[in-house]
From Swiss-Prot:
GO MF annotation: an example: proton-transporting ATP synthase activity, rotational mechanism
InterPro entries: ATP_synth_F1_dsu/esu (IPR001469), ATP_synth_F1_dsu/esu_N (IPR020546), ATPsynth_dsu/esu_N (IPR036771)
Family note: Belongs to the ATPase epsilon chain family.
NCBIfam families: ATP_synt_epsi (TIGR01216)
Protein name (record): ATP synthase epsilon chain
Keyword Nucleotidyltransferase: no
Record has Membrane as a keyword: yes
Highest classification ranks of the organism: Bacteria, Bacillati, Cyanobacteriota, Cyanophyceae, Synechococcales
Subunit structure, interactors included: F-type ATPases have 2 components, CF(1) - the catalytic core - and CF(0) - the membrane proton channel. CF(1) has five subunits: alpha(3), beta(3), gamma(1), delta(1), epsilon(1). CF(0) has three main subunits: a, b and c.
Role played: Produces ATP from ADP in the presence of a proton gradient across the membrane.
GO CC annotations, alphabetized: plasma membrane-derived thylakoid membrane; proton-transporting ATP synthase complex
Record keywords, A-Z: ATP synthesis, CF(1), Hydrogen ion transport, Ion transport, Membrane, Thylakoid, Transport
Localisation per UniProt entry: Cellular thylakoid membrane
Membrane topology summary: Peripheral membrane protein
Amino acid sequence: MPISLKVLAPNKNVYQGEAEEVILPSTTGQLGVLPGHISLVTAIDIGVLRLRMNSQWQSIALMGGFAEIESDEVIVLVNNAEIGSDIDVQNAEQDLKEAKLVMTKFPENEKNSEKIKALQEISKAEARIQAAKN
């Protein structure tokens, strides 16, 4: 029996369908979900959700949020998400270059909100690139 998967962002239903396997980027590492998984709620990091159906893998870039897993259902609530095949790789690579350029303006040991935001932008761009290439 396949898993029912929903990926929801505040402004859109990103994905709704079935999967034989789901791999989530939780804040404690990759979390694999198969049918009959134990129920849990977990925080989702910026990263790539991978789903397998009929031996085909699909990727979705996630921008942080939460996931609820119940036996054969996974609901992912995220700040934003993009289906890998919809991502413009060149645009994502340009975003990564720009975010890395912003990072060069900060001393290595300095911590402030602008540096944290730049680090998040790097993570987002890397997730988008990874999702687009998988």
